[in-house]
Amino acid sequence: RVDMRTGVMETWLGTGERKPTPDGAPLIGTAVNGPRAIDVDPQGNLYLALREGNAVYRVDTKAGRFVHLAGTGEKGNAGDGGGARQAKLNGPKGIAWSPDGGVYIADTENHTVRRIDLKKGSITTVVGDGERGDGPDGVALRCKMARPHGVFVDRRGNLYIGDSEAHRVRAVKR
């Protein structure tokens, strides 16, 4: 983090080691395996997409602990409709907290966007058919994407996706 008054930066999370991040581990002294994207909820909790870790974590800032939300750590594309922690992700690079009670992730190498339901602990694909490509516009689950990286959810719940190799910003409107 950066102290905006002094301009001094310091490491806030991670040890510099490429190791798995254990569920429930303290924030200090724990490895963070390939953080690629960060978002925050209104309570001040951070959400991390870990590319090399093929996982998603909540950083519980009040308790000072990592909470494992999704991904087994193994590369793959599995688990849709089931428990998010048992799902396989492949290089997640984007993350967005949403006011609808979910967290959206760009599951980059699977060419999809998936939603974690924070109350149920489940995961579903919401955009993309899993094949690399470009479009067509229309039904979100039939759309091909090419390595989506960024995701953003606005106050109204509209989802925006940076579809990197298709050179487009896609939108799913509520």
Regions found by a protein language model. Name each.
Residues 1, 8, 54-58, 111-115, ...:
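A short loop-to-beta-strand structural motif that recurs across blades of beta-propeller domains
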Residues 4, 51, 61, 108, ...:
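Short loop/turn segments immediately following the C-termini of beta-strands
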Residues 6-34, 63-91, 120-147:
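Gly/Pro-rich loop segments of beta-rich domains
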Residues 40-43, 97-100, 153-156:
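Residue-level detector of Asp-centered blade-edge/turn motifs that repeat once per structural unit
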Residues 45-48, 102-105, 158-160:
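Conserved beta-propeller blade signature
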Residues 94, 108-109:
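Loop/turn-rich, solvent-exposed surfaces of beta-rich toroidal or solenoidal domains
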Residues 147-174:
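Blade-level signature of beta-propeller repeat domains, shared across WD40, Kelch, NHL, RCC1
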